[in-house]
């Protein structure tokens, strides 16, 4: 494997220490290489510089109704073994955010009986952040010959394509879950009996410049296959 010059970063999520490349991104010191994040100058540049935003820092404008249709159509162009479309999109409208906040507030004590007023305030913030909110639902066909695992992978690919579509139109997205995605009360408000929330995706424009985050070195995560020795 080819190696490249690196810096040592402590506390990387993939281990106590991880090797990353020092860079400056959007005028901020980060790790990687000199780049413009979400660079739309070409398809390749956009893929190479894709960066999520923090949902709480996404502000108006968000995608129009026509742009949302484009984004969801792009999202559906994903690998899908068996052509099962094992995913759904649920759009939470601007006028429904308070209803979502109320739903999460009712679910919070079920998740944390000791929840404080600060926890409730955070739940309220979650429901109202960013101009547009899409709930991606994993809806696998359980008794099909295509394994559920493969169908769930397709759902993850749909969510990633959704972010790519939003980025291509100049927006920034954030894909998160949190405890609410695993709350039965919240799940049942968006999903059928055997479906699950794959994520809450928030779209808008960044209120602050995006900052690059640590990325693993290719040499640390990719390797040439070594066939096993014959028994």
Regions of interest found by a model, annotated:
Residues 1-34:
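N-terminal amphipathic/basic-hydrophobic helices that include classical n-h-c signal peptides
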Residues 22-129, 229-231:
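N-terminal amphipathic, basic helical "cap/leader" segment at the start of enzyme domains
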Residues 36-49, 196-231:
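C-terminal helix-cap and adjacent tail motif
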Residues 75, 134, 140-188:
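Small-aliphatic-rich amphipathic alpha-helix that forms the alpha element of a beta-alpha
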Residues 109, 128-141:
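Acidic-glycine-rich active-site phosphate/pyrophosphate-binding loop
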Residues 129-132, 171, 194-197:
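Short coil/turn connectors at secondary-structure junctions
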Residues 186-198:
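Short, electropositive alpha-helical surface patch
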